[in-house]
């Protein structure tokens, strides 16, 4: 069932195409199938064996399967594309899609360098295309409510954020998978999971100004690391302490500490198969309050927000400045794990 409904106002679904039909691409395709705001027309998949499997998949019987991104962009009916591709490819694919008149939804991270992110965003602005980003954690109902309360001053001055997004799912991947490659996914715990927490920290505190980070491979054979610690510093003195590991069972936690109280969100299961969130709230002079928030289709909510922006119903809720701030932080983190020093983060302009 779709998280929003557009049948009453007869808004046509956005004709969309998917680039990459791996682990996450399959999840995206299943989410699209539940939406009346999106219609999947085509998929690009370069792996011949995968394309053969797709040809006999009844789920894809009305979907065109191609091997060429260029041919895909020439499909006239296609309004938008979703990129589930290796990170190094994102910038050029965004630029090419925007030049072809397509709106673009890119899985995280948007790009691996600040200059590439600037180039990609500028192309979308120039061609008046909507750019979406796969930071679905922003769409969790508890995160939305928390940000509103922070904005209203309920928690006072925000002092610090503590967050953890760890998993061991990558042990199931072939050893030559691009997600385990130092070239295609440098600082693996960051590009896999930690970048979501960087985004949430920016959503709460704004762009960060400096970072120190440490990366190691301690519990796996992953060449791009499995254990990452990050300390982001923000203007005014607030910090975000972020932990991301790829060699331990799933943990998802986001906590914001303020001068009047604090708020913690814990995932019960991995976002791939969500089971809701345990919430803890502690206000100054009061007893702790715990509650449960039922699971919500956040991936779908993000995709439908993208579709609504394309149709002019609303602005896409992640700004270009926030996207740039995220990639600026990512690039500085990657520098810090090499230099072992505090690195300055580029201002998102």
Please annotate each region the language model reported:
Residues 67, 106, 131-133, 162, ...:
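Hydrophobic residues in well-ordered beta-strands that form the structural core
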Residues 1-10, 80-82, 305-349:
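C-terminal helix-rich "cap/oligomerization" subdomain common to oxidoreductases
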Residues 62-69:
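Conserved SAM-binding strand-loop segment of SAM-dependent methyltransferases
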Residues 80, 86-138, 153:
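Beta-strand-loop-alpha-helix segment that lines the small-molecule cofactor/substrate pocket
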Residues 27, 290-304:
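Active-site loop of classical SDR/Rossmann-like NAD(P)-dependent oxidoreductases
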Residues 1-60:
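N-terminal Rossmann-like dinucleotide-binding module
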Residues 137-214, 218-221, 340:
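Predominantly a Rossmann-like dinucleotide-binding segment in NAD(P)-dependent oxidoreductases
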Residues 192, 198-272, 300-314, 348-349:
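Contiguous beta-strand/loop segments that form the cofactor/metal-binding neighborhood of enzyme cores
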């Amino acid at each position: 069932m779709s998280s929003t409904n557009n049948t009453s106002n007869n808004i046509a679904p956005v004709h969309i195409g998917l680039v990459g039909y791996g682990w996450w691409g399959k999840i995206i395709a299943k989410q699209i199938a539940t939406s009346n705001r999106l219609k999947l027309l085509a998929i690009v998949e370069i792996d011949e064996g995968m394309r053969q499997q797709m040809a006999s998949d009844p789920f894809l019987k009305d979907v065109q399967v191609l091997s060429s991104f260029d041919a895909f962009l020439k499909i006239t009916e296609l309004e938008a594309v979703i990129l589930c591709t290796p990170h190094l490819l994102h910038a050029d694919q965004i630029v090419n899609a925007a030049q072809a008149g397509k709106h673009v939804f890119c899985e995280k991270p948007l790009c691996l360098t600040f200059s590439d992110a600037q180039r990609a965003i500028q192309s979308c602005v120039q061609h008046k295309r909507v750019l979406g980003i796969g930071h679905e954690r922003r769409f969790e109902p508890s995160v939305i409510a928390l940000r509103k309360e922070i904005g209203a001053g309920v928690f006072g001055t925000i002092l610090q954020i503590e967050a953890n997004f760890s998993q061991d799912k990558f042990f199931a991947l072939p050893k030559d998978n691009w997600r385990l490659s130092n070239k295609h996914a440098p600082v693996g715990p960051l590009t896999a999971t930690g970048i979501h927490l960087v985004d949430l920290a920016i959503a709460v505190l704004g762009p960060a100004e400096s970072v120190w980070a440490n990366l190691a491979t301690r519990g796996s054979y992953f060449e791009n690391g499995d254990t990452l610690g990050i300390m982001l510093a923000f203007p005014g003195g607030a910090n975000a302490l972020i932990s991301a590991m790829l060699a331990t069972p799933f943990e998802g936690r986001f906590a914001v500490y303020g001068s009047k109280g604090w708020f913690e969100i814990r995932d019960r299961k991995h976002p791939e198969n969500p089971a809701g969130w345990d919430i803890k709230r502690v206000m100054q002079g009061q007893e702790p309050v715990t509650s449960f928030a039922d699971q919500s289709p956040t991936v779908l909510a993000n995709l439908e927000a993208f579709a609504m922006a394309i149709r002019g119903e609303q602005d896409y809720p992640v700004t270009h400045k926030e996207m740039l701030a995220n990639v600026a932080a990512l690039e500085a983190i990657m520098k810090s794990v090499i230099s072992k020093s505090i690195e300055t983060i580029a201002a998102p302009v």
